[in-house]
Amino acid sequence: MRKIAIILLLLAGVCANAQTVVPAKPQKIYKKQDNKGILYFEESSFGALYKTNGWGFFYNKTKIIHATKKKFWEIEFNKTKHEKETKTESVFTQGGPITPKNYYYGKINSLYTISYRKGYTKVLTEKSLRSGVEISLNTSYGVSLGLVKPYELMLIYGDQTTDNITFKTEKYSSLNASTFLDQNSIYSYAGTWQGFFDMKPMPGATARIGLAFDWATFDDNITTMEIGLNVDGYLLNVPLMAVAKNHQVFPAMYVSMRFGNRK
């Protein structure tokens, strides 16, 4: 009887311990300490890019679908240059209302573009450790609005051998073409804001494909570099130069840096 009592006491103790064990909660699929799979649901970031024909700034919003796929949209502002743009030094050093500035000879317009793109990210190599790098393929397309701004120069009219001269800030036209393209009549670049209120819209489309390298995949912060090909096209030829062939389509290589956060 004594042995039976001892056995019953031991069994009672085991049962009591079993009742106090808290059942394990099911693990969430996405946890920061896992270092695998999707850790966040969306990204928000700002970036800058340099193209072989210009530069730009953009905002990116990304939704993470699963471990190897994301979708995003971007808004971008950029400037596109003609490949024949070459800065020229003014032949004048003083004598006018302003200090002479260098200018682009033959340039008649500047092109600024506001673009909206949507696209997808395909993760090619997942980052398994914090010290690793995630490589992804980004493809996107969208619509754009080009803003063609006149490129204005300060021109000299009159007899330069006398004091009977006049300085005029003008944009290119068929009436002043001979003076606008005469380096001896170009005193200076008029300035960035000249022609701002004479901008004309030019609708277009844009597409981009690139490889992205992200070395902060499992951190709250985003640090991503991307390299690839960008193509901008417009409804008509964009008149950027008076002395070179103008284009309707502008392909370019680019490199961009993007910084932001995940949540």
Q: What positions do the PLM features span?
A:
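Outer-membrane beta-barrel transmembrane domain signature
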Residues: S140-M225, N230-A242, N246, F259-N261
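Short glycine/proline- and aromatic-enriched beta-strand/turn motifs that initiate or cap beta-hairpins
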Residues: Q19-F77
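Residues that define the transmembrane beta-barrel architecture of outer-membrane proteins
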Residues: Y40-S44, K51-W55, K69-K71, S110-I114, ...
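Bacterial Sec-dependent N-terminal signal peptides
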Residues: M1-P26
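Flexible, solvent-exposed coil segments and beta strand-coil junctions
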Residues: K32-F41, V91-N102, Q183-T192, G233-L236
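Short loop/turn motifs that connect adjacent beta-strands in outer-membrane beta-barrel proteins
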Residues: K36-E42, I64-K71, I108, L124-I135, ...
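Residues on the lipid-exposed face of transmembrane beta-strands in outer-membrane beta-barrel proteins
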Residues: A48, F57-K63, Y116-K122, Y141-L145, ...
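Outer-membrane beta-barrel translocator/channel fold
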Residues: F77-S115, G119-T121, T125-L129
